[in-house]
Amino acid sequence: MNTDALKKMAAEAALRYIQPGMVVGVGTGSTTNFFIEALGAAKIHVDGYVASSIATENRLKAQGLNVLELNATGDIPVYIDGADEADPHFRLIKGGGGALTREKIVASAARLFVCIADDSKDRPMLGKFPLPVEVIPFARSFVARQLVKIGGSPTLRSGITTDNGNVILDVTGLDFSDPLRMEETINAIPGVLDNGIFAHRRADVMLFGSAGGVIERKA
């Protein structure tokens, strides 16, 4: 099975968490795109979907699905999104698609966070994938220097402006022995909007597509 088939398998398995009448949060990225396609085919009568990016909003609308503003919604029972890495403690690295800040906001607003991925994202420890950090452009050089001081090697992601009007620094070389502490340390740097460590708001359920079928884990 190729990677896309595994992603699609995990995405379709997430449909079991969607019930009629819900408001559903939807993430951003290649695996989530398969989930959006599955939603369009399933035609579950939910109240609406809260998108974590403009790209996701456009994809949902292209499927004829009702998109709601986060500020106009109350309870979000479930949020479905992918990950670039996941560890055994349900902590994640996200943001390869550049939507990490809005993803973290919608995930934090949801009661249940279901993460979908192919099984190559299942790692014993975070840190192989470069960590995305969303930075206000004015502070880019300053933030990069601070990241170097804590052991990181930041690279500006070229050609990318986030939906919030910011830039992304992709950082390698960081110590992920304590992801929660690293998340807090980076977010304390002035000029950082957020980073792609999801340790405060971990996933509640992991669905990994694998050659043997869907692997489901619950926190």
UniProtKB/Swiss-Prot annotation:
Classification of source organism: Bacteria, Pseudomonadati, Pseudomonadota, Acidithiobacillia, Acidithiobacillales
Record carries keyword Isomerase: yes
GO MF assignments: ribose-5-phosphate isomerase activity
Protein family membership: Belongs to the ribose 5-phosphate isomerase family.
Organism: Acidithiobacillus ferrooxidans (strain ATCC 23270 / DSM 14882 / CIP 104768 / NCIMB 8455) (Ferrobacillus ferrooxidans (strain ATCC 23270))
Name of the protein: Ribose-5-phosphate isomerase A
EC number: 5.3.1.6
Active site per database record: E103 (proton acceptor)
Any matching Pfam family: Rib_5-P_isom_A
Pathway(s) where this gene product acts: Carbohydrate degradation; pentose phosphate pathway; D-ribose 5-phosphate from D-ribulose 5-phosphate (non-oxidative stage): step 1/1
Catalytic activity: aldehydo-D-ribose 5-phosphate = D-ribulose 5-phosphate
Keyword terms: Isomerase
Function per UniProt: Catalyzes the reversible conversion of ribose-5-phosphate to ribulose 5-phosphate.
Superkingdom in the source lineage: Bacteria
The keyword Isomerase belongs to this UniProt entry's keyword annotation: yes
Amino acids binding substrate: T28, G29, S30, T31, D81, G82, A83, D84, K94, G95, G96, G97, K121
A single GO BP: pentose-phosphate shunt, non-oxidative branch
HAMAP family cross-referenced by the UniProt entry: Rib_5P_isom_A
CC per GO annotation: cytosol
Subunit relationships: Homodimer.
